[in-house]
Amino acid sequence: LLLTAMLKHEDITAAPVILSTRSHGKVYSIYPLLSQYNYLVTLAMVDGNAVFMDASEPLLGYGRLPLRCYNEEARVINETANVISLSANTVAEVKHTNVYVVNEEKGNIIGSKIQTPGYYESMNLRERVKEKGKEQLLADIKKEMGTDIDVTNLELDSLNLTDEVLGVKYDFELKGEKEDIIYFNPMLGEGYKENLFKSAERAYPVEMPFTMDEVYNLQMDIPQGYVVDEIPKSMILKLNEENEGVFEYRISMSGNSISFRSRIRIGRANFQPDEYEMLREFFNYVVKKHAEQIVFKKKS
């Protein structure tokens, strides 16, 4: 209410909006009760555009709401008490990762990763850095990458620009002796390790917090003194006939280099119970493919 009052004081048209957060449950639109609502945000008209604001999240950018607010129906507190929709289907998290792996002059395998997470993942990373520091984030990245990989030179672009997504950059080096066989997972810690949809059946709708589009690209040199012994197969899996989701897994060789691409796109956030098995099997396949490895064998 204070934010709404401040905007009105500056002659900006604004009104409070009441809603029910995702954990609080849905609002019954036919017979709404005040007890069904548990959260308040502000709706302002800026240059003819409707802008939602929430003063409770200091790291939340302009015109953004916390993910917990996207729970379908909300109600504007004005003369008409009109109903508006805050649907998770309108929230898109887009993540891009590019990885480059090359052979160093001494024969070591080194690389760099450049990543732009989605907006809300960027916000979570900012909170982690604020609470625990950049060094702890580096330690967490090392843990995700694996004990046989050393991570250095972490850079965070746009850390203090809360309206922007983060830019995450770091270098890495594969440690260890040159074994006769090298097992290399091209996802380098970015893959899905387990399926979030574990239950065999579900009686309630699936309500994800956003739609998603995650693209991961890797370009690597074949390690010096090695040849490719085994390589995963490329494939494309569609979520359904309406093409509301797709999983691409593409890998190819050209000369002494390997190109790899993984893309997961889910075009809507809400699914009915009879669609649960489809969604679960889709991510089962993602987990399976993301675990596959390239096998390099030392030249004889």
Locate predicted features.
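A sensor for short, sequence-defined functional sites
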Residues: L1-S300
